[in-house]
Structure formats: structure tokens, C-alpha cells
């Protein structure tokens, strides 16, 4: 950028490679709405890319809000260009057609050319977009006239420098248009100030038209002009819209107000009705043709403005390679948004009707009770004599149909995208439940039932929270049942030696615990009640242990081992003996008893697997006998009468079974208990005693 261009109030940009000069000199003329260029001007298909220091001048398709018009000098002729600030440091440079008609343009001054012309010389210090394009800086009518006059004088000076002036009609049109300064000022005020005020501030009047304008404005603004969540829309309706409706109701007749609201609901066109025209303009844009978005039917001004802005936002993408698939994707999201906004709007209309006349909802409830009767004849006669729907019923039917469409759309979208989050339930949780569930409980329940969202209701979550008993109460009931278990067993006393893990006792205790739990009022258990689940787990483990004990093999020493042991015993008498461990001594005693049994006939006291299992089964089945409650493996201590006087070198053979006998094996005594004589089904147990050292003979 050169400083000598500042006196000419122009700026330079880098020219394309096929141009003779390396830069383009641009004289700014005026700023016009970008929409006018999109609608009325044909744009060439030849797009060029320019760079100027750190700025990037790119050519995009028609979109945006405002464009700076200027002239470019070339070797052949002058050419009109349009420069648009898009976003950040991105700009669009468009070569426009020479067939311009400034009378058809509405001139607005959303930037000050005095500041922009001064800043053209130092672009490197400050971004060009910060000075050239200020969409929010509005000018007063008097200042607007001065700026228009300055623009005209600058344009006339630029035309005088040209050797040929084939485009002098531009300045003439500017001068002719500036003569009617009042009309320009009036148009500017109507188009910029009043529309912005109507878009963002509610009207202060208290008539029906002001309420309808506010409803139209808020509806299309949320649908087409913003990307904020719909929860902000419902907050606005609960606040501003509801307050304005109440004030209008105080000044207007109720019947007229209700009729106007119903007419408003009928006049809301679906986005499907506008799709064909939107798609036609989109395809014209892809083919580099001029397009003008208008609707055949009568449309509200906010609706037209909203659809134009929505379409421009689609076209004004960073990636210029947009296709029809992108349009379909954006339109599908717009359809979903329309369903959500309409559901909230119908809820708010129902609230207003109910607030103005509660009889609407009462008559609706009575009609439902009659229609739900089982008598088909009465139902048919009721349908024949039914009158037209009241306003409450009309709005409710629209609400139900719209919510059905929302459910279908969300289901299709969730199946196509495979999202984990349910956006339909999220919408109900954030908007319907907190704002309208308490006012319309029956309607809300019917809608949530369609999307499996009944758990979102406060009373249902309250029931789930209190359906399970408190944990302290559950634990106390279990402890009481556990303490009552011993008293509910058989009347006979249980000996201390009885096994606590028998299968019959465990199953019986489990049945008692279940009966105690049912009597104590505990009806349901949650997944957090791990104590009772632990008891069931222990019960199954104990029963499996008993089955494993029954099937366990009892390994007894074979006859070959006993013969080998006897032969080794004869050899060991000739050698000095070493100190044996307790296990070896116990094994020797068992082998000695086994060898004795092999000689004598088989008796009831033999250690066989079949006899042991029969004893085990008999002890479990006969619970009534105290002596048979266990396997009765008893350890009998050594009697005080059994005095060892001398330890012989060789073991003593077992005597006859009719007398009490003692078998001495080295330093241990195997004693048969007197109780075993009366009950031959009992077992032998080896009892260790304190070894006694052998007294050495005196020399």
C-alpha cells in the first residue's frame, strides 16, 4: 500500500497474473445491501483470487450483508467491483456487470467513508475490515446527506481523470438519487431502524396486532435467524409473550383475541411448503444465475426475511463446494427445529386459553370421560351429537399431531446417525417437563408415553425413589430373621458337634428367612441390597460343598502296601530306630489296624467308603435323633486309668473286640472309646499322647 494513494482516496490490491499491472487501484463509491446484488445483478463465472499483505481477497458466491462498491482502472476500461467483508480477515471481490441501476438500490451507510479512506494508507497497522465495514454504525439523516455528497464529489473527480468516460451515468444516477434526499432518509429509517426495533424489542401497544407481530417475530427469529437452543424460546414465551398476552387480554374482548390466535396457528406455513422455492433459488445459485426469493402465497415480512437469511447462511460457507446434499441436510435440521418450536408454541397457547377460561379444559375432560365409556351405542350417539371443537381442543389436537411428527423425525434421525444420546428425551426434559408438566399433567403424560419418557415426570421419579424400603429397615428385618432361625428348627436340642452346613438345615433356614422377609413387609429388593444376595450365594456354595463331600473318594492303604510295611518292620528291628514324625506314626497305626482287619471277618467298624457314606446320609436324613445329627467323628482323650508302665519293643496285637483294648505303637496309644462298644457304627480315631522316654538300665 502506497501513501500517494491516500490523496486519491483509493486503495490497491494485488492483481491477477493475467493482468498487465501487478496491482488494482480501487476507488470506493458507496456501500449497498448484499441482498440487492444477489437479486438483481448477474455475476460473471470468472472468479479470481487476490492477496494484499496479510489480507486474503477471495471470490465467493453471493451472500452476506453489505458490499462496498468501487471502480477499478485497467488498460482497456474501468470496471465496477464489489468488495464484501465476510469474516475476520476474509473478503470477497466480485467483478460486477456494467448494467447497473442505482435507482433500484436502497443506499445505506453502515460505515463511514471518511474514516475508511484515511485508513487505506495504513492497512498493515489495522485490519481493513475494522475500518471499511461497520455494519452496526448507523448515521443520522443529516450526516447521511453529507456523506452522500462526499461520495458523489469523489466519484466525479475520479471520472474527470479518466480519458474515456463511458460510465459517467453512475455519478449522474448518484446525483439524481441524492436530489430526493428526504425519500432516501425516509427509506433508510424505515428499512434499518424501525425493522431492527421491531425485530428485537416488543411493541408497546396493547392491541391484537402487536401481540401477533410479536408471535410472528419470535417464531421466525428462533426458527430461521438464530442457532440458540429452543429452551431460550420457551423462556421468552413464559416471560415476555405471556406478559404481553395478559395485557392485551385486559384491553381486548376475549372472543376476538381467541379467534385471532387460532387464525395465527392456521396461517403458520410449514417449511415443507417453502422447500420447492428454496431449492430452486439454491440451484440457481449453483448455476451462477440470479435468484430472487419470493413466495407465491402471501407471506409475513418476518418470514421472507428469515428464509432469505437462512439461505444466505447456507451459501456463505467457508467451503465453497456446497452441494444439494448439504441443502437437504440443513433442511432436515430446520424441519426438526420447526417441530420443537411448534410444540412449545401450542403449549403456550393452551396455557393462555386455560388462564382466560378454565371451562375449556373442564369441558374437554368431560368429553373424554364420555368418549371413553365402554358402551359403544352411547359412544356413537355422542359422536353424532358432538359439536365443533372448542379452542382448547383445537390447539391440543395440533399439539398431539406435531409431537407425533417430532417423534417420527427424531427416530429416523437417531437410527441414521446412530447417536447414543436421545435428543427427543432431552428436549422433553429441558422444556416440556419443567414448564408445562404441572399445568397440563394429563397432556404431558400422554405425550411422554409416546416417546417412553414417563420416567421424566417428577411424581414418577418420586415413586421410584420410595418404592424400595430404606436400607436400615431392610437390614434390621434380615437381622431379626437371622436371630429367629435357631428357634424355628426342630424341638430337639442340637449338639455342638453337629455340622452347621448340612444341606437339609440350609434349605430349611433359607425357607424360614424367605417367610420372615415376606411377613416383615419387604416386597422388593434393589440391586444395592447385597446382603441378601450374599446369603443366597453362601447358601449355594455350602450346598455344593456338601455334594462334593459326598462324591469325594476316600483313599485307603492297599494290601500290597501293608505287606510291604510288615516286611520292612521285620527288617527294622535289627537296626536302630530313628525318631518318626507324627504323620508317619499315625500311618503305621492305621496300617496295623488294617492288617488286623484283613485277618478277621468284616465288622461294622471297618473303614470303608460305602459304610462312611451310609453313615453320612443317615446322619443327614435322621434329624430327630440327637446322636445322629452329625458324622460323630469324636476325639476321645486318654483315660486316667490307662497308665503306661512299659513300652515294649514290638507292637501289641489287637485283642478281641469284646474287651476294651489298647494298641501301643512306639510312643502312641490308640484307644477304643467305651462309647463305641454300644454303637458299632462309630469310627476309630487316633489320639496322640505325650511320649514317655524309656528308662535306661543302671550299669
From Swiss-Prot:
Keywords: Cell cycle, DNA replication, Meiosis, Nucleus, Phosphoprotein. It comes from Schizosaccharomyces pombe (strain 972 / ATCC 24843) (Fission yeast). InterPro entries: DNA_replication_reg_Sld3_C (IPR013948), Sld3 (IPR042511). Pfam families: Sld3_STD. It is found in: Nucleus. Residues 535-553 have a biased composition (Basic and acidic residues). The keyword Membrane does not apply. Gene3D superfamilies: 1.20.58.2130. Residues 487-505, 519-533, 556-568, 590-601 have a biased composition (Polar residues). This is DNA replication regulator sld3. Required for loading and maintenance of stable association of cdc45 with chromatin during initiation and elongation of DNA replication. Also involved in temporal regulation of origin firing. Plays a role in meiosis. Residues 459-505, 517-568, 590-610 are annotated as: Disordered. One of its GO terms (cellular component) is chromatin. It comes from the Eukaryota. GO terms for biological process: DNA replication initiation; meiotic cell cycle; mitotic DNA replication initiation. Its main location: nucleus. Phosphorylated. Interacts with cdc45 and minichromosome maintenance proteins mcm6 and mcm7.
Amino acid at each position: 500500500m502506497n501513501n500517494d494513494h491516500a490523496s486519491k482516496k483509493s486503495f490497491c490490491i494485488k492483481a491477477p497474473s493475467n493482468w498487465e499491472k501487478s496491482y488494482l487501484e480501487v476507488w470506493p463509491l458507496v456501500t449497498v445491501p448484499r441482498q440487492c446484488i444477489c437479486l438483481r445483478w448477474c455475476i460473471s463465472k470468472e472468479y479470481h483470487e487476490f492477496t494484499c499483505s496479510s489480507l486474503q481477497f477471495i471470490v465467493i458466491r453471493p451472500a452476506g450483508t453489505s458490499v462496498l462498491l468501487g471502480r477499478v482502472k485497467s488498460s482497456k476500461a474501468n470496471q465496477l467491483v464489489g468488495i464484501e467483508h465476510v469474516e475476520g480477515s476474509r473478503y470477497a471481490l466480485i467483478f460486477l456487470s456494467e448494467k447497473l441501476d442505482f435507482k433500484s438500490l436502497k443506499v445505506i451507510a453502515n460505515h463511514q467513508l471518511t474514516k475508511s479512506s484515511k485508513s487505506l494508507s495504513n492497512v498493515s497497522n489495522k485490519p481493513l475490515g475494522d475500518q471499511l465495514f461497520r455494519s452496526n454504525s448507523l448515521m443520522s439523516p443529516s450526516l447521511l446527506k453529507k456523506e452522500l455528497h462526499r461520495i458523489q464529489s469523489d466519484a466525479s473527480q475520479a471520472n474527470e481523470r479518466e480519458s474515456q468516460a463511458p460510465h459517467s451515468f453512475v455519478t449522474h444516477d448518484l446525483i439524481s438519487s441524492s436530489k430526493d434526499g428526504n425519500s432516501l432518509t425516509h427509506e433508510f429509517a424505515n428499512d434499518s431502524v424501525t425493522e431492527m426495533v421491531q425485530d428485537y424489542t416488543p411493541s408497546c401497544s396493547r392491541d391484537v396486532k402487536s401481540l401477533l407481530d410479536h408471535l410472528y417475530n419470535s417464531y421466525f427469529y428462533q426458527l430461521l435467524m438464530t442457532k440458540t437452543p429452543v429452551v431460550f424460546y420457551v423462556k421468552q414465551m413464559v416471560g415476555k409473550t405471556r406478559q404481553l398476552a395478559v395485557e392485551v387480554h385486559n384491553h381486548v374482548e376475549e372472543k376476538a383475541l381467541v379467534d385471532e390466535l387460532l387464525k395465527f396457528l392456521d396461517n403458520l406455513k410449514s417449511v415443507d411448503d417453502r422447500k420447492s422455492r428454496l431449492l430452486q433459488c439454491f440451484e440457481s445459485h449453483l448455476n451462477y444465475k440470479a435468484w430472487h426469493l419470493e413466495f407465491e402465497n402471501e407471506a409475513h415480512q418476518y418470514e421472507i426475511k428469515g428464509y432469505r437469511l437462512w439461505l444466505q447462511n447456507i451459501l456463505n460457507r467457508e467451503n465453497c463446494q456446497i452441494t444439494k446434499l448439504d441443502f437437504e441436510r440443513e433442511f432436515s435440521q430446520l424441519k426438526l427445529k420447526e417441530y420443537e418450536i411448534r410444540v412449545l408454541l401450542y403449549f403456550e397457547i393452551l396455557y393462555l386459553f386455560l388462564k382466560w377460561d378454565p371451562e375449556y379444559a373442564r369441558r374437554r375432560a368431560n368429553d373424554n370421560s364420555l368418549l371413553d365409556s365402554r358402551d359403544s351405542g352411547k359412544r356413537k350417539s355422542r359422536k353424532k351429537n358432538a359439536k365443533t371443537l372448542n379452542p382448547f381442543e383445537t390447539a391440543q389436537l395440533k399439539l398431539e399431531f406435531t409431537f407425533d411428527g417430532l417423534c417420527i423425525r427424531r427416530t429416523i434421525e437417531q437410527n441414521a446417525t446412530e447417536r447414543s444420546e436421545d435428543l427427543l428425551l432431552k428436549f422433553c426434559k429441558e422444556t416440556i417437563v419443567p414448564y408445562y408438566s404441572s399445568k397440563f399433567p394429563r397432556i404431558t403424560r400422554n405425550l411422554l408415553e409416546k416417546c417412553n419418557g414417563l420416567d421424566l415426570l417428577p411424581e414418577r421419579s418420586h415413586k421410584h425413589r420410595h418404592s424400595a424400603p430404606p436400607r436400615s429397615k431392610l437390614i434390621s428385618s434380615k437381622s431379626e430373621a437371622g436371630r429367629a432361625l435357631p428357634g424355628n428348627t426342630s424341638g430337639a436340642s442340637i449338639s455342638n458337634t453337629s455340622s452347621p452346613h448340612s444341606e437339609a438345615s440350609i434349605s430349611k433356614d433359607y425357607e424360614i428367612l424367605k417367610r420372615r422377609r415376606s411377613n416383615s413387609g419387604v416386597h422388593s429388593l434393589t440391586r444395592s441390597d447385597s446382603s441378601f444376595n450374599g446369603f443366597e450365594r453362601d447358601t449355594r456354595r455350602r450346598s455344593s460343598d456338601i455334594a462334593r463331600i459326598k462324591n469325594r473318594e476316600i483313599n485307603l492303604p492297599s494290601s500290597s502296601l501293608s505287606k510291604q510295611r510288615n516286611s520292612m518292620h521285620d527288617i527294622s528291628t535289627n537296626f536302630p530306630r530313628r525318631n518318626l514324625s507324627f504323620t508317619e506314626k499315625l500311618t503305621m497305626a492305621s496300617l496295623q489296624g488294617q492288617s488286623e482287619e484283613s485277618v478277621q471277618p468284616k465288622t461294622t467298624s471297618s473303614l470303608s467308603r460305602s459304610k462312611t457314606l451310609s453313615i453320612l446320609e443317615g446322619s443327614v436324613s435322621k434329624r430327630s435323633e440327637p446322636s445322629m445329627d452329625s458324622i460323630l467323628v469324636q476325639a476321645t482323650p486318654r483315660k486316667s486309668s490307662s497308665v503306661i508302665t512299659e513300652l515294649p519293643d514290638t507292637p501289641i496285637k489287637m485283642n478281641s473286640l469284646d474287651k476294651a483294648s489298647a494298641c501301643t505303637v512306639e510312643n502312641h496309644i490308640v484307644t477304643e472309646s467305651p462309647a463305641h462298644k454300644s454303637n458299632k457304627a462309630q469310627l476309630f480315631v487316633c489320639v496322640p499322647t505325650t511320649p514317655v522316654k524309656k528308662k535306661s538300665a543302671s550299669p
